[in-house]
Amino acid sequence: MDNEAIRTYALKSGEGRTYNYGIDFTVKAGELGPGRRVAVLEYTTRSGEEPPQHTHTTEDEIFYVLQGALTFRCGDDTFDVEDGGFIFLPRGIEHGYSIRSAGDVRLLVITSPSQPDATGGWGGFVGDLETQGEPA
């Protein structure tokens, strides 16, 4: 890994690069650039905007619920996760979520490893945001 190309930085609440890709996603740590091994996004969603059940073949996904309540399905298991809750979704297992709370749900999502050159699925999604998303 080329650590010289990576610099230390801190972001305040609400900071990051925000792109609209149907909904606004704020990139806290992107996929583009040498040495990237993790991608971190914050976004707000609501009932009706949930993704379909899907599988990531190359990366694990971690959700930290900043606000709201969701039900996650991962394989045959179901988990209720609320404010301050965390869920780890391993690669290779079909998963998705449904929103249980009224109003906005705020999520911090971490994927590892990031996949800037991947096509399809989550792999490369953050890189796509950074190159194709409309700045919000």
Give the positions of each predicted feature.
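Conserved short histidine dyad/triad with adjacent acidic residue
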Residues: 27, 41-56
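Hydrophobic small-molecule pocket/channel-lining residues, especially in calycin-type beta-barrels
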Residues: 32, 49, 57, 69-70
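Short beta-strand His + acidic residue motifs that chelate non-heme Fe in jelly-roll/DSBH
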Residues: 53, 72-73, 89, 95-101, ...
